Regions:
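Intrinsically disordered, low-complexity regions of eukaryotic proteins
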Residues: 5-7, 30, 90
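Short, cationic motifs built from Arg/Lys/His that form the positively charged side of catalytic pockets
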Residues: 1-5, 12, 62, 66, ...
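Short linear sequence elements within intrinsically disordered, low-complexity coil regions
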Residues: 15, 55, 118-120
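A structural micro-motif at secondary-structure boundaries
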Residues: 22-50, 107, 114-126
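Positively charged, aromatic-enriched patches within helix-turn-helix-type DNA-binding elements
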Residues: 35, 41-47, 51-89, 93-102, ...
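Generic cytosolic/nucleocytoplasmic N-terminal low-complexity/intrinsically disordered segments
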Residues: 1-6, 47, 96, 109, ...
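Hydrophobic alpha-helical context, especially transmembrane and signal-peptide helices
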Residues: 17, 31, 101-103
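Basic, amphipathic DNA-recognition helix from helix-turn-helix-like DNA-binding domains
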Residues: 1-24, 125-126
Length: 126
């Protein structure tokens, strides 16, 4: 994993603060602006979809249980079957919106989800 600050130069030599960006393959998340692009094209996500994608990308390779995601993203305690289905529906919609790149979100049967990427992973401005 490479970490790097990306700074924008302004007239007079002043710089803006580092832009925090997560990239995996063709997916890019600008954390300051809370926006996502795939192959450079903006993707409209709900707040929960954005938070799910960010959590999955930040913990790439780790299996995240439905219970963990419900607590982290929704603030719920013990998950019920209905709550667990909420995660499944949001993941399904997120995959659809990401198109072919949605295939990087893998289901781990009876547990949860994992973001798997076979490309170079870069995290800027940590």
């Amino acid at each position: 994993m490479n970490e790097k600050d990306v700074k924008t130069l302004h007239p007079g030599g002043a710089t803006s603060p580092p832009v925090r960006t997560l990239r995996a393959g063709a997916i890019e998340i600008n954390l300051q602006r809370s926006n996502v692009t795939v192959h450079g094209k903006p993707i409209k996500l709900t707040t929960k979809e954005f938070e799910l994608l960010r959590e999955l990308m930040e913990t790439r390779g780790e299996v995240l249980s439905r219970e963990f995601l419900l607590e982290k993203i929704w603030g719920y305690g013990k998950a019920s079957e209905v709550d667990s289905r909420t995660i499944d529906v949001h993941i399904q919609r997120l995959r659809q919106k990401l198109g072919a790149e949605g295939g990087h979100i893998l289901t781990v049967k009876n547990v949860g989800y994992r973001f798997d990427i076979f490309y170079n992973w870069i995290k800027f401005g940590a």
